[in-house]
A protein has these predicted regions:
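P-loop NTPase nucleotide-binding core
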Residues: 42-47, 51-156, 337
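Conserved Walker B catalytic segment
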Residues: 127-195, 204
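Helix-loop-helix "sensor" segment of P-loop NTPases
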Residues: 201-252, 274-275
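C-terminal helical "lid" of AAA+/P-loop NTPase domains
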Residues: 247-253, 259-273, 308-311, 344
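A short, basic N-terminal segment
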Residues: 1-39, 44, 59-65, 353, ...
Length: 377
C-alpha cells in the first residue's frame, strides 16, 4: 500500500492503516457474506459507506484469496440497460484466469451481445463490454448471472446506491433482479444505499420483491473516542497533539459526519499548527469559503419558498416538526401547504434529509454557509 503524505484520506480507500475503526461493522458484514447471507447497508452519504465496503473487501481478499469481490456504483445509471452494461464491464472476464481459451469461451458465451474486449490502461487487465438492445435486456442479465454461476467461484458483489433501480423506467426491475439473485449458489451481495426511506421500503415492505431477502445494517457514526484515538495517533506522526475536548469540538461541529471530519483533519495536518478550537474554526471557514461559488449557485437555483425553508432549517440545524406553527412563524415562512411543497422538492434534490427524526441540511458546509450568509432571509 502506498505511503501517503497526509494520512487523513478524503476521497477513495487507501488501505486499512488509514481507515478508522468500523471493526464491529466490518466483522458483521464479513460474517454475513461468509455465511451465505446478502446484506443491506444503509447510511446517508459521507458517513463512510463506500470506504467500509472496500475495507471489507480488502479484509476478505486477505483471508480468502480465491474469493472474487466486485464493487459497482449505479448512481449514474438511468435505466436497466445501463445497469446491465456496468455490471457486465465489472464482472465479465474478471473471474477467469487470463488466457486465449478463457477469452474465446467468454466471447462465445456472450456472442449474442457483441462482446468487445479492451485493456485497462492502468492495470492491463482485460475488460469486456456488451451491447444490449431493449429486447435483450432480460436475457442479457440472465446470461451475466449464469456466467457467474458457471464459474463455480465464490463471488461477492457490492451494488452501491442500489435504490437507483427503483427509479428506472422499466417495470419490474426489482422483481427481475430478485428472480435471478435468489438462485445463485455462489454469489452473495451487499446492497448499499444512501436514501434511507427508499432502501427501507425496498427491503422491509411486504409488497416489494426484495422483502426480507437480506440482513439489514444501518451504519452508525464512528464512535467519538475511537475517532479521537485514530486522529491523535496520526497527528503524532507530525508532532502534533489534540486534546479530547478539542477533538470533540471538531466532531460535534460537523455532527460526527466522517467526510467533513476527515476534510478538516486533513487541512489541520497540512497546516502543522497548534490544534485549538480557534484553528479548527479557521480551517472550517476556509473550507466553506472555497466552495462559496457552488453554494451561491445552489441557493440561486431555488424558488423563494425553497430558499426560505432551507435557510430556516440551517438556522435551527435540526428540525423535528417542520410544519409546526412555531417553526413556520419563527422564520416567517409561508403557509404550511407551501412549506410542505418546498420540503418535498428540497428532499428530492438532496439539499435536506431526515436523520434520527429530524430534518437536516445534507451538506454540513453548505449549512454553515447558509447560517453565515442567509440568516433572516
Amino acid at each position: 500500500m502506498e505511503q501517503l503524505n497526509n494520512p487523513f484520506v478524503i476521497y477513495g480507500y487507501k488501505g486499512t492503516e488509514y481507515f478508522c475503526d468500523r471493526k464491529k461493522e466490518t466483522d458483521l458484514i464479513m460474517k454475513a457474506l461468509q455465511n451465505e447471507r446478502n446484506i443491506v447497508l444503509i447510511s446517508p452519504r459521507r458517513i463512510g459507506k463506500t470506504g467500509l465496503i472496500h475495507h471489507v473487501f480488502e479484509n476478505i481478499s486477505k483471508q480468502e484469496p480465491e474469493t472474487h469481490c466486485f464493487y459497482l456504483d449505479i448512481n449514474a445509471t438511468r435505466n436497466l440497460s445501463q445497469f446491465i452494461q456496468l455490471l457486465a464491464k465489472t464482472v465479465i472476464g474478471k473471474v477467469d484466469t487470463f488466457s486465449q481459451t478463457a477469452m474465446r469461451k467468454i466471447t462465445t458465451f456472450f456472442a449474442g451481445y457483441k462482446p468487445t474486449m479492451s485493456f485497462d490502461e492502468m492495470t492491463g487487465i482485460p475488460t469486456f463490454s456488451i451491447t444490449v438492445s431493449p429486447s435483450q435486456r432480460e436475457d442479457s442479465l440472465k446470461h451475466i448471472f449464469e456466467y457467474l454461476k458457471q464459474s463455480e467461484k465464490r463471488i461477492y458483489i457490492a451494488i452501491d446506491e442500489f435504490q437507483q433501480i427503483a427509479e428506472y423506467p422499466e417495470d419490474g426491475t426489482e422483481a427481475l433482479l430478485r428472480s435471478y439473485i435468489q438462485f445463485l449458489p455462489n454469489v452473495y451481495f451487499i446492497f448499499a444505499g444512501s436514501k434511507q426511506h427508499m432502501m427501507t421500503d425496498m427491503f422491509l415492505s411486504a409488497k416489494r420483491p426484495f422483502y426480507q431477502s437480506s440482513q439489514i445494517l444501518n451504519l452508525p457514526l464512528i464512535n467519538l473516542d475511537e475517532y479521537y484515538r485514530f486522529a491523535n495517533r496520526w497527528m503524532g506522526t507530525r508532532n502534533l497533539t489534540m486534546d479530547h475536548d478539542t477533538f470533540a469540538y471538531l466532531y460535534n461541529k460537523v455532527d460526527g459526519q466522517t467526510w467533513y471530519i476527515q476534510d478538516i483533519l486533513n487541512r489541520l495536518y497540512q497546516n502543522g499548527k497548534e490544534i485549538t478550537t480557534a484553528e479548527i474554526d479557521d480551517v472550517t471557514l476556509e473550507l466553506v469559503n472555497e466552495q462559496e461559488v457552488a453554494f451561491v449557485n445552489y441557493y440561486d437555483s431555488l424558488t423563494d419558498n425553497q430558499a426560505a425553508l432551507l435557510s430556516a432549517i440551517a438556522q435551527d440545524k435540526a428540525v423535528t416538526s417542520i410544519l409546526s406553527q412555531d417553526f413556520i412563524s419563527r422564520h416567517n415562512l409561508p403557509a404550511a401547504s407551501s412549506v410542505s411543497l418546498a420540503l418535498k422538492t428540497l428532499i428530492n434534490r438532496e439539499f435536506i434529509y431526515k436523520y434520527n427524526g429530524s430534518y437536516i441540511i445534507y451538506d454540513r458546509f453548505f449549512g454553515m454557509w447558509l447560517r453565515k450568509n442567509c440568516a433572516g432571509n
